[in-house]
């Protein structure tokens, strides 16, 4: 199937063909990938908590030290096109996951609507509903489960 030249880049390019800027722009800014997750030892299901990484701004859902995040948070996960087969743990609304699955971006995504606030206004992000990992002991994270990764 031919895709028109004027189609958005995420519909006409493979993940590997994206520039670094195009790749980064797929991020909708929801911050969900920066929430602490727990894995069920019985069935390996991944559950999101409302506990945010210490670097995540709880209102803007942006990393407060993006350039140095790996030095400050050694287990921070770097999303790359080469790891697309591992994106199943990302929310079903995630731009990276959607594009890797050959799906289009939702109407509220900033690349579609031009408004980076829509991710918050549509309540896709957890803006204002998260707790910092500084404020919750790791033993209590299970008390803050919000959804299961699909």
From Swiss-Prot:
Family indicated by similarity: Belongs to the UPF0260 family.
NCBIfam families assigned to the protein according to its UniProt record, in alphabetical order: PRK05170.1-5 (NF003501), PRK05170.1-6 (NF003502), PRK05170.2-5 (NF003507)
Name under which the protein is recorded: UPF0260 protein PP_4587
Native source organism of the sequence: Pseudomonas putida (strain ATCC 47054 / DSM 6125 / CFBP 8728 / NCIMB 11950 / KT2440)
Coiled-coil ranges from the UniProt annotation: none
SS bond partners: none
Entries under Pfam families matching the protein: CxxCxxCC (PF03692)
């Amino acid at each position: 199937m031919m895709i028109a030249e004027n189609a958005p880049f995420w519909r006409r390019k493979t993940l590997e063909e994206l520039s670094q800027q195009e790749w980064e722009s797929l991020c909708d800014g929801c911050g969900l990938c920066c929430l602490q997750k727990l894995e069920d030892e019985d069935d390996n299901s991944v559950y999101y908590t409302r506990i945010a990484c210490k670097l995540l701004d709880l209102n803007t859902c942006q990393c407060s030290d993006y350039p140095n995040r790996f030095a400050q948070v050694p287990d921070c996960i770097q999303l790359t096109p080469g790891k697309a087969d591992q994106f199943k743990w990302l929310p079903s609304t995630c731009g990276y996951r959607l594009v890797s699955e050959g799906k289009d971006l939702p109407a509220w995504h900033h690349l579609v609507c031009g408004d980076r606030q829509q991710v918050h206004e549509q309540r896709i992000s957890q803006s204002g509903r998260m707790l910092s990992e500084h404020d919750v002991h790791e033993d209590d994270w299970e008390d803050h489960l919000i959804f299961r990764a699909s």
